[in-house]
Amino acid sequence: MAIGLIGRKVGMTRIFNEDGASVPVTVIEIAANRVTQVRTLDTDGYRALQVTTGTKKANRITKPEAGHFAKAGVEAGRGLWEMRLADGEGEGIEVGAELNVDIFADIAKVDVTGQSKGKGFQGGIKRWNFATQDATHGNSLAHRANGSIGQNQTPGRVFKGKKMSGHMGAERVTTQNLEVIRVDAERNLLLVKGAVPGATNGDLIIKPAVKA
């Protein structure tokens, strides 16, 4: 696993490349990620970096959090995230260090993880892209009904995992192999081609693409 960073979705825009083609991009703000803890095989049984970013009001910080941030010698952030490390990764990174967007300067593609927009309770047509039933020809009540959900007396039940109506969205989603269009180290911005999960101002985890 490669070292990733925590960012914030600013929104979408478009830029023009050298050929004059319009490229849709998502702007991700990646403020300095401050290392709050370095987990090791000896003490924790696995290797990882724990980071925070952003700020948090003093009256919103619990005493355990305050002690944890004080021990690391970093400003309290809006949350804590961990990045697993493979052997040989993260060597030399110590508690209190800052990781910035420039680590993506030589990266061509990234994977972006976020929480998708919540859609509430939705039917099968919106949630699973089911086809609608007949608009006419005797159909009066079942235009958007799911249809059959099983077989017969055997098996006599609905299988687990059957696609049906239910809560849609608000779940962890990863979009893979997004092309890095631009890295703006001065303004802490990363521009990637296409859309990323979640709403504006949502937290994102950006890592070098595993399938690149």
Swiss-Prot record:
The modification N5-methylglutamine is found at Q153. The keyword Iron does not apply. InterPro entries: Ribosomal_uL3, Ribosomal_uL3_bac/org-type, Ribosomal_uL3_CS, Transl_B-barrel_sf. Keywords: Methylation, Ribonucleoprotein, Ribosomal protein, RNA-binding, rRNA-binding. Disulfide bonds: none annotated. GO terms for biological process: translation. One of its GO terms (molecular function) is rRNA binding. Methylated by PrmB. Gene3D superfamilies: 3.30.160.810, Translation factors (2.40.30.10). It holds the Pfam family Ribosomal_L3. Transmembrane segments: none annotated. The keyword Nuclease does not apply. GO terms for cellular component: cytosolic large ribosomal subunit. One of the primary rRNA binding proteins, it binds directly near the 3'-end of the 23S rRNA, where it nucleates assembly of the 50S subunit. NCBIfam families: L3_bact. Belongs to the universal ribosomal protein uL3 family. Part of the 50S ribosomal subunit. Forms a cluster with proteins L14 and L19. This is Large ribosomal subunit protein uL3.
